[in-house]
Amino acid sequence: MSVINLSDLDLNSKRVLIRQDLNVPISNGVVTSDKRIKASLPTIKMALNQGAKVMLMSHRGRPIEGDPSDGFSLQPVADRLSELLNTTVRLEKDWLDGVEMNNGKVVLCENVRFNVGEMVNDDELSKRMAAICDIFVMDAFGTAHRAQASTYGVAKYAPIACSGPLLSEELDALGKALDNPKRPMVAIVGGSKVSTKLTVLESLSKIVDQLVVGGGIANTFIAAQGFNVGKSLCEYDLIPIAKKLMEDCEIPVSKDVVCGKEFSDVAEAETKASKDVADDDMIFDIGPKSAQQLADIMRNAGTIVWNGPVGVFEFDQFAGGTETLGKAIAESNAFSIAGGGDTLAAVDKYGIEDKISYISTGGGAFLEFLEGKKLPAVEVLEQRALEVIKLA
């Protein structure tokens, strides 16, 4: 990846517009999880310390474009930023015609999705955003897979468009895991359906040494080996694809599973061999023998990419597989990267965040990167960097 980095630029007295991912949970006007806000602070401080005029922008939720509802306002985020930065962070509601501010100060622009044309990458809106800054900084990996006005269009027209530290760090970590991995390389892909992760599975099967499948996805692979999966979620029409993937790549399939009769936090869990699943069983987790097999694979791995739990870990009786796997990844000497909402929830639940080499902030963007797709917001930064090289 060849892009301009924020750290390479002189920011003194410059109008710096930073696209961040401040889409955080809010209850009764108060931020309930400020992880993303805290992650954004080093970039903000870098610009402030150089005497820049700092304008932050982000989306929050899915409001109706053109309808600035208080329910989707970024005011609670501005309040929390003010506390964390120990300075007043003003929320700018009308910012598209420019913001009056002094050097070394920061404002938060109101929800970008209040602007008509944001989601469809409207050209005129993109130009208006670009006109209020000297430097545009893309620092929201979680939205890098979306070609929208505040992620893509503004980067086309801003005088300078660069990558922020968060985005650069994310891309470096993913590149290290996928482009030049230490072997053996192992990927874990969980989720409810093969169909939703098919492109990821096919892409990873070409580069990994072992591919671990979990969750509902694993049921289709168990069925592909001729075993009964009872009433479990299973895509029987994709069994030929599962068989093809198993021919192309080493995919360890569970020899034992944990079943229940209903999807419930009070359902009784029963461990049994995969070959003994009854017609009225539902598979909700891998069994302890299979979990131990996966743990051994993780401990010997050189690179681990983790996207998705291997069971219904939200229910404690079906959480053993994901817990064993997660702790084995944490204990491994491998370079490990974890991404996806359910995966991060598991990382939090088992307290292993500081033992994973890199935690990806992106959901959809993380998946698309694993699929081998170009991320539009990164692609446009590469194009802008190329223009600078040609002019030099």
Curated annotation (Swiss-Prot):
Question: E.C. number, please?
Answer: 2.7.2.3
Q: Which InterPro entries match?
A: Phosphoglycerate_kinase, Phosphoglycerate_kinase_CS, Phosphoglycerate_kinase_N, Phosphoglycerate_kinase_sf
Q: Which UniProt keywords apply?
A: ATP-binding, Cytoplasm, Glycolysis, Kinase, Nucleotide-binding, Transferase
- List positions binding ATP: 197, 314, 340-343
Pfam families xrefs = PGK
Pathway it belongs to?
Carbohydrate degradation; glycolysis; pyruvate from D-glyceraldehyde 3-phosphate: step 2/5
Q: Name one GO biological process term.
A: gluconeogenesis
The UniProt catalytic activity note for this protein reads:
(2R)-3-phosphoglycerate + ATP = (2R)-3-phospho-glyceroyl phosphate + ADP
The record's PANTHER family line, in alphabetical order, gives: PHOSPHOGLYCERATE KINASE (PTHR11406), PHOSPHOGLYCERATE KINASE 1, CHLOROPLASTIC-RELATED (PTHR11406:SF23)
Annotated HAMAP family = Phosphoglyc_kinase (MF_00145)
Task: Report the sequence similarity comment from the record.
Answer: Belongs to the phosphoglycerate kinase family.
The protein's name: Phosphoglycerate kinase
User: Can you name the source organism?
Assistant: Vesicomyosocius okutanii subsp. Calyptogena okutanii (strain HA)
